[in-house]
Design a protein with these regions (language model features):
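Active-site mouth loops of central-metabolism enzymes
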Residues: 1-16, 49-54, 181
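Active-site beta-loop-alpha junctions enriched in small/polar residues
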Residues: 2-6, 37-39, 72, 77-84, ...
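Acidic-and-aromatic substrate-binding clefts and catalytic sites of carbohydrate-active enzymes
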Residues: 11-14, 77-78, 106-114, 140-143
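Histidine/acidic residue-rich metal-binding segments in metalloenzymes
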Residues: 16-26, 47-73, 79-99, 112-126, ...
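Short acidic/histidine-rich active-site segments
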Residues: 133-134, 161-185
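Mid-to-C-terminal alpha-helical segments outside catalytic/metal-binding sites
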Residues: 183-224
């Protein structure tokens, strides 16, 4: 079991069957990550070599459908390209939001952990959010990222999907290599100031830092 946005997030290791989701939902789980660094019994991962991109397995499709019906938001961060596309399509069947809790735009940093523009737009269309990750390799093609690279990602995403669909997904607990200015949570104020100085409206900054993610979480939950 992982922890993201409090205790609202669980990795697939804690969920063995679609039926078990009922128990997790009753305990407050609101976000499900079907896959992590490597492929598993549910889906292929962005960490796998391209030939291994088989997408969702039948069990994975069943779990995503069950999560969507229960109001549990599915997270496509770490999912392979095919798996992410299939998750978005399945969630759309139930009108459920999808999130990328800690992924960036591949257009700015060509890394398999980042998402392509079509998937980013689909997340926004679902009503979900994309959380900007602070890991240097996901921010820029350069070895070491700067605060300006984070600002660039945020602005790109705001322009692409709209200010209501961008959030912060720093991934500090993920042993990342962040920009020096964002070595820990104390750097958030620096980022907020840098965004405003770059022309991002203050109300958009407030939405990106908290309101957008809270909106999605507050709308999640067990459905009748």
């Amino acid at each position: 079991v992982g922890a993201l946005a409090g205790d609202a997030w669980v990795e697939v290791d804690g969920v063995k069957t679609p039926r078990s989701l009922f128990g997790w939902a009753a305990r407050g789980v609101r976000v499900l990550g079907p896959v992590h660094v490597f492929k598993n019994e549910l889906a292929s991962s962005s960490g796998d070599a391209p030939p291994a991109d088989f997408g969702l397995t039948p069990k994975g499709r069943d779990l995503v459908r069950a999560a969507s019906r229960l109001g549990i938001v599915v997270d496509v961060s770490h999912a392979s390209d095919r798996a992410a596309k299939e998750i978005l399509a399945l969630a759309a069947e139930n009108g459920s939001p999808v999130v990328a809790t800690h992924s960036n735009a591949r257009a700015l940093a060509d890394h398999p952990r980042n998402l392509r523009d079509p998937e980013l737009r689909a997340i926004a269309k679902s009503g979900g959010v994309v959380g900007v990750n602070f890991h240097s390799a996901f921010l820029t093609r350069n070895q070491t990222a700067t605060l300006a690279d984070v600002v660039r990602q945020v602005k790109y995403l705001v322009d692409l999907v709209g200010p209501e669909h961008v959030a912060i997904g720093s991934d500090f607990e993920g042993e990342i290599r962040p920009p020096a200015e964002l070595a820990d949570a104390e750097g958030y104020q620096k980022l907020a100031r840098a965004l405003v100085q770059a022309g991002v409206p203050k109300d958009t900054v407030e939405a990106v830092f908290a309101k957008n993610a809270l909106r999605v979480l507050c709308k999640s939950g067990v459905r009748d």
